[in-house]
Amino acid sequence: GSGNFGVAKLVRDVRTKEHFAVKFIERGHKIDEHVQREIMNHRSLKHPNIIRFKEVVLTPTHLAIVMEYASGGELFQRICNAGRFSEDEGRFFFQQLISGVSYCHSMQVCHRDLKLENTLLDGSVAPRLKICDFGYSKSSVLHSQPKSTVGTPAYIAPEVLSRREYDGKVADVWSCGVTLYVMLVGAYPFEDPDEPRNFRKTITRILSVQYSVPDYVRVSMDCIHLLSRIFVGNPQQRITIPEIKNHPWFLKRLPVEMTDEYQRSMQLADMNTPSQSLEEAMAIIQEAQKPGDNALGVAGQVACLGSMDLDDIDFDIDDIDVESSGDFVCPL
């Protein structure tokens, strides 16, 4: 698939037969602070509900970002197909979303563009949710407080729209609430169903926190209560991620692997997995800022990945339109 920053391709490691998604970004001026931030933030994150970053590789024409491939496509598509989810199914995915976001925040990374289109699913029967696309994320360790307005209007918190300095972690909570609402209702909470493209109206409704759960949607009072604690205009009074994780609705049928104790033990085990060093990644990004040889097409780039023998990645599905096929979607 192609987007603003480049193309995404599905590739296969010829040794392990494992599939990966590779985002190709043209060398030169496109390798800017956004790209650098995406890579730096993403490479630090190792969690079952976050698309795993593998490495960056330089080809003569492009910077290639190699990451885990989620074969189940977008959560958005699953909702489109279903219309809306039952409360139990919505909770199943919301628990995973909060688990991933909570981990990001513990690593001092706020995503800032959480939406259904940035949540993918793996291919398992009970699908595992995977957060992707860290192009707008901001790490408080590396960066100052977010000031710019990013994101899709439907998901944006009121404090982000008002362009004041805001806490990205608290704004992420709002976006998680929008995601939960869409899963359960099959519509956006602050859009006028008669005028969904009227962004001015959507923004007015967000700023005045004007939403309701339709009568035809049967959800518990606990769920309604949680939504009412997320959709709070004043960020200081909004429920926090740790509070969500203790909310009765969230705790119901919480899988063992979602508990904090289990996740801490898994993270310790994960420390041993080798990762491309920060220095190595930085050096490749710096080199990628120099313009490359533009004579090669995408097939050539993928061939370069193999011929350079970097992890022996081989091109698998020739020129598949990965975006529309639903195999891999990552808005670039």
Swiss-Prot record:
Keywords of the record: ATP-binding, Kinase, Nucleotide-binding, Phosphoprotein, Serine/threonine-protein kinase, Stress response, Transferase
Per the UniProt record, the lineage of the source organism begins with: Eukaryota, Viridiplantae, Streptophyta, Embryophyta, Tracheophyta
Q: Does the keyword RNA-binding apply?
A: no
The record, for CDD domains, names: STKc_SnRK2 (cd14662)
Its function, per the record, reads:
Involved in water-stress responses.
Disulfide pairs here are none
**Protein name as annotated:** Abscisic acid-inducible protein kinase
Query: What triggers or suppresses the expression of this protein?
Result: By abscisic acid (ABA) and dehydration.
Superkingdom classification of source: Eukaryota
Query: Which EC number(s) does UniProt give?
Result: 2.7.11.1
